[in-house]
From Swiss-Prot:
Keywords: Endoplasmic reticulum, Glycoprotein, Membrane, Repeat, TPR repeat, Transferase, Transmembrane, Transmembrane helix. TPR repeats lie at residues 482-515, 516-549, 550-583, 584-617, 618-651, 652-685, 686-719. Belongs to the TMTC family. The gene is Tmtc4. It is a multi-pass membrane protein. Coiled coil: none annotated. It comes from Mus musculus. The chain crosses the membrane at residues 11-31, 111-131, 147-166, 167-185, 199-219, 225-245, 266-286, 355-375, 383-403, 413-433, 442-462. SMART domains: TPR (SM00028). It is found in: Membrane; Endoplasmic reticulum. GO terms for biological process: endoplasmic reticulum unfolded protein response; outer hair cell apoptotic process; positive regulation of endoplasmic reticulum calcium ion concentration; protein O-linked mannosylation; sensory perception of sound. It holds the Pfam family TPR_17. It catalyses: a di-trans,poly-cis-dolichyl beta-D-mannosyl phosphate + L-seryl-[protein] = 3-O-(alpha-D-mannosyl)-L-seryl-[protein] + a di-trans,poly-cis-dolichyl phosphate + H(+); a di-trans,poly-cis-dolichyl beta-D-mannosyl phosphate + L-threonyl-[protein] = 3-O-(alpha-D-mannosyl)-L-threonyl-[protein] + a di-trans,poly-cis-dolichyl phosphate + H(+). GO terms for molecular function: ATPase binding; dolichyl-phosphate-mannose-protein mannosyltransferase activity. This is Protein O-mannosyl-transferase TMTC4.
Amino acid sequence: MVELDADLDHIVPSVLPPFWAKLVVGFVSLLCFARSYDGDFVFDDSEAIVNNKDLQSDTPLGDLWHHDFWGSKLSSNTSHKSYRPLTVLTFRINYYLSGGFHPVGFHVVNILLHGSISILMLDVFSVLFGGLQYTGKGQRVHLAPRASLLATLLFAVHPVHTECVAGVVGRADLLCALFFLLSFLGYCQAFKETGNKEGTHSSTFWVLLSIFLGAVAMLCKEQGITVLGLNAVFDILVIGKLDILAAVRKVLHKDKSQENAGMFKNGGLLFRIALLTIGGTSMLYIRWKIMGTGPPAFTEVDNPASFADSMLVRAINYNYYYSLNAWLLLCPWWLCFDWSMGCIPLIKSVGDWRVIALAALWLCLIGLIFQALCSEDSCKRRILTLGLGFLVIPFLPASNLFFRVGFVVAERVLYLPSAGYCVLLTFGFGALSRHTKKKKPVAAIILGILLINALRCVIRSGEWRSEEQLFRSALSVCPLNAKVHYNIGKNLADQGNQTAAIKYYREAVRLNPKYVHAMNNLGNILKERNELQEAEELLSLAVQIQPDFAAAWMNLGIVQNSLKRFEEAEQSYRTAIKHRRKYPDCYYNLGRLYADLNRHVDALNAWRNATVLKPEHSLAWNNMIILLDNTGNLAQAEAVGREALQLIPNDHSLMFSLANVLGKSQKYKESEALFLKAIKANPNVASYHGNLAVLYHRWGHLDSAKKHYEISLQLDPVAVGTKENYSLLRRKLEQTQKKDV
C-alpha cells in the first residue's frame, strides 16, 4: 500500500532491499531470544521430552503415529489427544544428534525456527500491506517495504513469543507457524497471471501444495488447519474483491444485478474453495478418527469457565479470557507459565468490574470490523480484513467455541495471532502519522515499543532458563494460582529444601483444597520426616477426592506400613495396582511389606513383577539378592545377581550385593573383582571397603584386609562391625608377627 508506506516515511525513513531487510529481521529475532540457548528443560519439557520414550531409539518410529505429544497411546482414556507426530519426530532427531537429553541443541533449534518464521513474515506482511503483484517472469514484487519491515520487527521482538521459543515444547507452535506461513505464501502463488492453459494447472498445483502444507502444519500442532480458512478469506475478500457491505445491501434490497456474482465465475474461485473445503474436511475427519476414544477429559481446575452451569457465565468468562489474550498482545509485561488454578477468578455476575474489559474488547473489534467492511478504500479493507483474519482465525481452536480446551489463557497459542496484531498496530501507526504534523513523537513511540519489547524478551528468556526462576517469576503475576506454589514447592523439594517446600505445598492446598497432587507431595515429605499422622490424613483425603490416584494410594500404603498397619497397607498397594496395572514402584513397596511380614515367597514374587515391568529397577533386584542371601539360598541369589548385572551392568550397588554372595560361596577372585568395580564406581561408601576387607580377611590377604578396614573406618568411624573385625585382624597380625619372631 503506497499511501501507508508514505505515512511511515518519516518513521522508517530508508527503504531496505528485501535481502537486507530479512538480514536485519533475522538478526534482531535471534538476538532477542539468544539468552535462552543454554537453558534447562523446564515445566512441560520434562513430560514431553525427558520422560517421553518416543524420543529414544527403543521406540519404533511407527509408534509416533499412534501416540500423543506426551508419548501416551491415543487410544488411552488418559491421553490428552494432542496429536503432533512431526514435532515429536524433530525432538527425536534432536535427541539423536545431541547424543542424549542435552538441552542446548533443542533450544538452538527453537531460536533458529523463530528467526526463520520472522523472515518469512516479511513476505507475508508484504502481501497483506501491498497486495499481490508479479513481474513478467512470475516473481512476486515486494510491495510496502516500510510497513512490512515495521510489522515484522514488531513480531520478531514480541515478548509473548518467549514461551514458544524458550520452552522446548513450544516448538509445536513454531513448526505449525512455519508451515502455516508457507501454506499461505504457496496459496498466493496460485494467482500468477500466465495467460495460458498451463497457468490453470499451475494454479491447481499451488492450491494443492498449500493444502498439503496446511496438513503438515496440523501434524505439528492442531492449530495449523486454520490456514485453510485464512486462505479462503484471502481468496474471497482480497482476490475476489467481494464487497460484503455491498452484497448485504443487495440482499436487503433484493437487487438481482450480477455485479458481485461475476467473481464466482471468474478465476476458478469456486473450484479453489471446493478444494480447500474437501481438504479441510478430510483433515478433520482423519484427525477425529485418529483421536479414537473421543475428546480429552479435562477437569474444572484446567478451565473453570467451561464447567459453569450458566451459559451466560460461560459466555462472559470466555469473552473475558479473549480480552486477557488481547491485553497480553497489547501489553506483554505480565507473563506467566500457567494461568490455571485460580489465577483468573471466575466472573459470576455482570456486576463484576472486569466486565468493562469485555466491553472494551468488543468496542475495538466492532470498530475494526466496521472499518474493514465499510471503508471505500480497498487497500484499507484488505489490510484490516487480513489483519483481523490473522488475529482471529488461528485463535479459534483455543476459543472454547467448538470444544473445551484444557487451559484458561496460554501465551503459546498467541504466536500466530500476534501477526494479526502487528498488522493492525502498524496500520494504526500509519494512520497516526498521517493525522499528526509532528512525526518525531510517533517515531519515538515506535522505537520505544521495539526497544522495550526487545528488553522484555531478553529478561523473560532469562526467566525461562531454569524452573526456579520461571516459577518464582509467576508469583507476582498469579499469586492465587495453586499450581505456581506447587511447582515452586516441587522445585525446592528436588533441591532438598524440604522445610521451604512444605510451606509452598501447604499454600497450594490452601488455595485449592482439592489439589490432590500437592497433597500427595506434601504427604510424601511429611512421611520422610516421620510426621506419619498428618501424612496419612493428607493422602487419605487425596484418594477420597480422586479414588483412581494410584500414586497417592501407594504412598498411603507406605505410611500405613510404617505405622505397622500391614493389612491396610496391603489393601492400599493392591488398590494402587488396580488403578495402574504397570506400576513397578508399587510392586517394589508391596514386596517390602511382605518381607517385613516374613512372607518371603510373596516378597520375591512382588519384586520379580517390579523387574519385569521395569528391568532397570535396581532396588527390586537388590532386595531379591539380599533376601535370598539372608535365607541361605546362595545359588539362587547368585543367579538373580548375574541376571540383574546383565540388564544394569554399571550399577555399583548390584555389584556389591553379588560380590557378598560370591564371597560367601568362596568364589573369592570373582567377588574381589566385583568389589573393586563397585569401589571404583563409588569410592566413598564405607560398607564397600568394609566388606572387601572381610573378604580379604577370610581369604588370608591380611595386608589388603587391613588397608580396606582402615579406609572404611575413615569413612565411617562409628561402624561397630567394622571396628570389631579390624580388632580381630590386628590381633591376628600381632600373633603372626610373634610367631615369625
